[in-house]
Amino acid sequence: MARKILVVGGAGLIGAGAALHLAEHGHAVSIAGRTPPNSKALSKLPFVRGSFLEDDITDAQLRGFDSLVFAAGNDVRQLPPGEDEAAYFHRANSIGVPAFFARAKDAGIADAVYVGSYYSYVVPERVAASGYLRSRQAADDGVRALAGPDFKVCSLNAPFTIGYVEGVIALPIDASVRYLLGQYGGGGPRWMIPGGANFMSILSYAEAVEGALERGENGKGYLVGDENWSFAHYCELLMDALGIPGKIEVRDAEHPSMPDFGLYAGRGATVAYEPDPDMLTRLRYRRHDAERAVREMAPYYRKLAEAA
């Protein structure tokens, strides 16, 4: 059944991928954010200007939708200069995200998906020491606590998500490509930190969003994912897709394209897991799609790097 869906954070990689996928599958999708997206494909979708933190997405606007996909959790990119990190993330994520979902529930939205972070699921022992991780866990818990007979909500907790949408720049991917192209990093042999992560294409994630809206268990937090790769293997796949010969050295040092402040599992940690079979049966997203995503995104990010 076609739905009227609002995607908050639709200008980011995950939100954009979900919005376009849902629109391609016959849903009436609008995206919401502070500024219109810089993407030809996304610009074809209706745009709702506003910030969930400022309450300027009105209740009347929310009442026009059947479903909500929320991909606007705040991270270091939104942290205002000079502001206390823990206090900001508590206000934006711990408090702001569940409050927005409560408004959506009160407005009559029937189904919602929260795009969460996988860290509290895979390294729960590190949550207490990080204001950011505490805020993402609190947002996830707070959103799912709103589940009820008239409001179906679940979370999809994302791993390292890769791919591209024209006009959208995912900074971690952009940084890795620029490093491999030699645009920064000091020259010398290309290297990467030890450890690894679970990687997932934005198409697989978008299919998981669609599955969650249609068949997700109310109040459930899902740990989604696809392929377990070392960071070195990921960079070698990127090098191959970029046409760069050679292999990646592994060094236990802070990396220019993957700095320690963004490694919430810790430098050298390997986050590896297999998605739950029951979840896969319910959400029905494709597997083993991450390598395709690397091959397809590499020319796009090369073009961005060479135009800079």
Enumerate the language-model features and the residues they cover.
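Conserved Rossmann-fold NAD(P)-dependent oxidoreductase catalytic core, especially the SDR/UDP-sugar
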Residues: A86-S135, C154
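Conserved beta-loop-beta element that borders a ligand/cofactor-binding pocket
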Residues: G116, V143-V168
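N-terminal Rossmann NAD(P)H-binding glycine-rich loop of SDR-like oxidoreductase domains
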Residues: I5-H25
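A conserved pocket-lining segment of Rossmann-fold NAD(P)-dependent short-chain dehydrogenase/reductase
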Residues: V177-M200
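NAD(P)H-binding glycine-rich loop region in Rossmannoid oxidoreductase-like domains
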Residues: S39, L45-I95, Y121-P124
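Mid/C-terminal beta-alpha module of Rossmann-like enzyme folds, strongest
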Residues: G196, I202-Y264, R284-A308
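SDR active-site strand-loop-helix element
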Residues: V8, A32, A71-A72, A112-Y118, ...
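Glycine/proline-rich active-site loop of Rossmann-fold NAD(P)-dependent oxidoreductases
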Residues: G163-V177, A212-Y222
